[in-house]
Amino acid sequence: MSVFPEGFLWGGALAANQSEGAFREGGKGLTTVDMIPHGEHRMAVKLGLEKRFQLRDDEFYPSHEATDFYHRYKEDIALMAEMGFKVFRTSIAWSRLFPQGDEITPNQQGIAFYRSVFEECKKYGIEPLVTLCHFDVPMHLVTEYGSWRNRKLVEFFSRYARTCFEAFDGLVKYWLTFNEINIMLHSPFSGAGLVFEEGENQDLVKYQAAHHQLVASALATKIAHEVNPQNQVGCMLAGGNFYPYSCKPEDVWAALEKDRENLFFIDVQARGTYPAYSARVFREKGVTINKAPGDDEILKNTVDFVSFSYYASRCASAEMNANNSSAANVVKSLRNPYLQVSDWGWGIDPLGLRITMNMMYDRYQKPLFLVENGLGAKDEFAANGEINDDYRISYLREHIRAMGEAIADGIPLMGYTTWGCIDLVSASTGEMSKRYGFVFVDRDDAGNGTLTRTRKKSFWWYKKVIASNGEDLE
């Protein structure tokens, strides 16, 4: 008998900005991700250190065409249905509904597109799990308002959220507000559309923007429940706990501080108030949060469940050695000598998933949902035209086993959506060659290819996993 409960939501995940393409079609406006190029300038732009308010003819922007989900969603959803998906996590591009971000009325072409996507899911009995903002702030809000440093974005996001909840009522009941909300501390332009001025306190800007996002998230949660009490709203963390690099007390404390840095956001979203430790953190960073009257009351609108991504665990030391560093999912970490690593240097640690899940449930006492997990790897065609991605099967098998152990530990887990179930553009590197999917998409890092979809060996394996409710992992 399977340890996974009846009704467990097996599926996969994509994001609008990494799969849709069609960046100027259907009335869509430009977003932050549309300005992030492939190549040497990518990281500086993502960090908010290099202003990119205009597109350049001499650069390649992977998001502009991506994998063309916008035109191929019926084919892609049919592939998901063939695997037996119970849930499909995707996102709505804010600028498809509000091209500038600050309009009063939405773009009906955008609403019609997503309605068609969600109806296609429901046709196959697939529940949509929808993220409202997945690293794609409308560029107009960046250039005209300073993005999330400006309180006005709370109003704009609330209008956008209400539009989504009302337009897709009856089609979508599982919602996430902000994808990997803690990434704004590590990749500020990607996470929150922040661009820094020379000499300003970046921590102050980031945490003030974080406050605005947290208030907006709480308001969206409140609105979702008002529109339909059956709606379930989750927060979303770039997860992976920090191990102390040694048993040296200073290293243990360093790991605790790094965990708090990431969990701060979820502490607010799941508990409804700023954690006690934040006062000292803000004081030492020179941060004073400018709150509006009523903000503390708004924050009490806590989420229904806690969702998270998990790719790897992390290591912290009181003496972080740059020569021994890794950056799994953008968050900097020391390399763990006890772990094997992926093609991109990310540690592979299934037990770390069980540890992370136990830690998070102990802390929040809310249902968990693992909405991103997977192995970015280089896939090659064999002579017979097949892609034998046994390395991906091995990675997923061990992480599913770890999930099962966590469930046996008493943790309520709602579901599991593997990341990039159909190959997509990597958010961190902009590459197509960093592939996660069960389905190969014929496109290279320079944007060449036919976009033809090809099932990998893992496609058939995951289909068997779902059919057996996680019991058959061989």
Features from the language model and the residues they span:
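A short acidic, glycine/proline-enriched capping/turn motif at secondary-structure boundaries
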Residues: 86, 95-97, 135-137
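Internal amphipathic alpha-helical repeat/solenoid segments
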Residues: 65-78, 99, 110
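Glycine-rich, proline-tolerant flexible connector loops at the mouths of alpha/beta enzymes
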Residues: 92-106
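Active-site mouth loops of central-metabolism enzymes
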Residues: 58-72, 149-152
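Catalytic domains of carbohydrate-active enzymes, especially glycoside hydrolases
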Residues: 72-93, 301-306
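Active-site region of glycoside hydrolase catalytic domains
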Residues: 1-57, 100-102, 111-474
